[in-house]
Swiss-Prot record:
The gene is tolB. One of its GO terms (cellular component) is periplasmic space. One of its GO terms (biological process) is protein import. Disulfide bonds: none annotated. Gene3D superfamilies: TolB, C-terminal domain, TolB, N-terminal domain. It is found in: Periplasm. InterPro entries: 6-blade_b-propeller_TolB-like, PD40, Tol-Pal_TolB, TolB_N. This is Tol-Pal system protein TolB. Keywords: Cell cycle, Cell division, Periplasm, Signal. Pfam families: PD40 (PF07676), TolB_N (PF04052).
């Protein structure tokens, strides 16, 4: 289980103590425009943080986060000329320019008298000879990886001007066993595949987990007692409850942006329609009313519109409607069928799964259906989910002849596709908002 106390234990001092101790020059030169499409990764040197093994481990996670983004190219430490012995002092900038390190990260990790870890870092513009930013954090020792992710986010934001996505978690379906006796459990992990924990025991089939905006709840579909139902799971306590005891099958749940409602598909009399349920009053509202299968609803980030999948035209396509169910409009018109639409946190794009020509592809289009782009194609790619900054997607892939699915990430350029390593097969990922 994800303990809320662990999240609250992390005290972010940056902006208060950090602002006084670590200055940021207004004329720092290093920047990375990530809106230009395919860019050259920025060479960056991430030194081992002082003191000891923990400092080296923190810097390794930071470098791995930055490299995995595809926007940074951490320089091999064997090329370093200067050995940082005092992260408070200005480095020898000429030594770092020689190895083309356009940015430099230094820092230290120490243990306080009360047992907490204190982690601090400085980001330097080597060619301008200036410090760009610096922050410090306090946390319990078991949260050291979170500190590393937060520092990586701070570096990402300072250089790109946009929020990072490293201090996040992913909930997914962990799959083990043979195809004939497949065990599926809800699981949660850090976005880089570490700190995996199972949330259910695998006795029932589970599908489509989704985070609440508060990050403290997950909604998902379960076949407990042979009855397909939508459930709410409290991550702190492990307590779960059914979202409405409907006579028909409920599936494809997702929270509204304000966390007050769950939108889902309810099957009755052979067809499925989109409903919302107010989580306080438990009242339901029907949004679609067709003889087709309407499913996979997803809110726009402002909560004003909903994208969904419907086969009312003969095969699955993507539709958009207002949050009250009015103005239902088809937006996908390419070859093949479209499914699993999910709105970007930025509101500018909708990601989807497309089946055409014997392949399953992950793509994006604008909310009006224009600008369709396929990011990756293969034997079976499905279930895109957005990083909270709207720059990266995660999905699951079943390769031809493989024993089970695996998770992959890819950026909006269609480049930097990477395997997200998990202890077992994995499917149905859902990315959390940034942690607090």
């Amino acid at each position: 289980m994800v303990k809320c106390s662990l999240i609250r234990a992390l005290m972010v001092v940056a902006g208060l103590v950090g602002a006084a101790a670590f200055t940021t020059p207004a004329n720092a030169l290093v920047e990375l425009n990530i809106n230009k499409g395919n860019i050259q990764p920025l060479p960056i040197a991430v030194t081992d943080f002082l003191q000891g093994d923990m400092g080296a481990q923190v810097s390794q996670v930071i470098a791995a986060d930055l490299q995995r983004s595809g926007l940074f190219a951490p320089i091999n430490k064997t090329a370093f000329i200067e050995k940082i012995s005092n992260p408070d002092a200005a480095p020898r900038f000429e030594d770092w320019k020689v190895i083309n390190a356009q940015a430099l990260v230094t820092g230290r990790v120490t243990q306080e008298a009360d047992g907490r870890l204190r982690a601090e870092f400085r980001l330097w513009d080597t060619f301008a000879g200036q410090q760009m930013t610096g922050q410090q954090f306090y946390t319990q020792p078991e949260n050291w990886r979170r500190v590393a992710h937060i520092i990586a986010d701070a570096i990402y934001k300072q250089i790109t001007g946009e929020e990072g996505y490293f201090d996040t978690r992913v909930v997914f379906v962990s799959e083990s066993g043979t195809k004939q006796q497949r065990k599926r459990q809800l699981a949660i992990m850090d976005q880089d595949g570490f700190n995996v924990r199972t949330l259910t025991d695998g006795s029932d089939l589970v599908l489509t987990p989704r985070f609440s905006p508060s990050r403290q709840e997950v909604t998902y579909m379960s076949f407990a007692n042979q009855q397909p139902r939508v459930y709410l799971l409290q991550l702190e306590t492990g307590q779960r409850e059914v979202v409405g005891n409907f006579p028909g099958m409920t599936f494809s749940p997702r929270f509204s942006p304000d966390g007050q409602k769950v939108i889902m598909s309810l099957q009755q009399e052979g067809n499925s329609n989109i409903y919302t349920m107010d989580l306080r009053s438990r009242t339901t509202t029907r949004l679609t009313s067709t003889a087709a299968i309407d499913t996979s609803p997803s809110y726009s980030p402002d909560g004003a519109r909903v994208s969904f999948e419907s086969d009312r035209g003969g095969k699955p396509q993507i539709y958009v409607m207002n949050a009250d169910g009015s103005g239902q409009t088809r937006i996908s018109f390419g070859d093949g069928s479209y499914s699993t639409p999910v709105w970007s946190p930025r509101g500018d794009l909708i990601a989807f799964t497309k089946q055409s020509g014997g392949k399953f592809s992950i793509g994006v289009m604008k909310p009006d259906g224009s600008g369709e782009r396929i990011l990756t194609s293969g034997f079976h790619n499905e279930g895109p989910t957005w990083a909270p900054n709207g720059r990266v997607l995660m999905f699951f892939r079943q390769a031809a002849g493989a024993g089970g699915p695996q998770l992959y990430s890819i950026d909006l350029t269609g480049y930097n596709e990477q395997l997200v390593k998990t202890p077992s097969y994995a499917s149905d990922p859902a990315w959390s908002p940034l942690l607090e």
